[in-house]
Amino acid sequence: HKEYRRQRQMCIRDRAGVIQGYEARLAPDEVGLGLTVFVGVKVERHHERDAAQFRQEVSALPEVVAAHLVSGESDFLLQVVVPDLRAYETFLLGTLLKLTGVKDIRSNFAIQTVKPHGPLPLDHLGR
């Protein structure tokens, strides 16, 4: 009965939109993607249309596994995964720098991943 209740609760959450999907997490190194780069991007502020175009272009890039609009020094923070430094150079020069409205790019290379994926902190829901 315990397993049935757990599955029922997951089904209810799934229907309520709490669960956004299910995925297998691959080990990047094991599939030849040994370099993770966090890329801060500043964009030109001339037209909202350009910013929308930039968001659309970034969303279509398979190397970009996460993209966030952020406050601070950069406008966007991208998480890029590529095989190696040479592949990142090719991606940077051949793709990123050519996106609509890009003004400046700052690359930060991950030396070691300490916590790749954590669960959401849901303690506040129990209050």
Positions of predicted regions on the chain:
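Single conserved hydrophobic/aromatic residue that forms the stacking wall/gate
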Residues: H1-I12
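Conserved beta-strand core positions
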Residues: R8, V37-V39, F76
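Alpha-helix C-terminal capping/helix-coil junction sites
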Residues: D14-R15, S59
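Beta-hairpin "wing" of winged helix-turn-helix
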Residues: A16-L26
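Short beta-strand/turn micro-motifs at beta-sheet edges
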Residues: R25-E30, V65-A66
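Short glycine-/aliphatic-rich beta-strand segments at the starts of folded cytosolic domains
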Residues: P28-R45
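Non-DNA-binding regulatory cores of transcription-related proteins
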Residues: V43-F109
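Short, low-order "capping/linker" segments at domain edges
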Residues: V82-R86, K115-R127
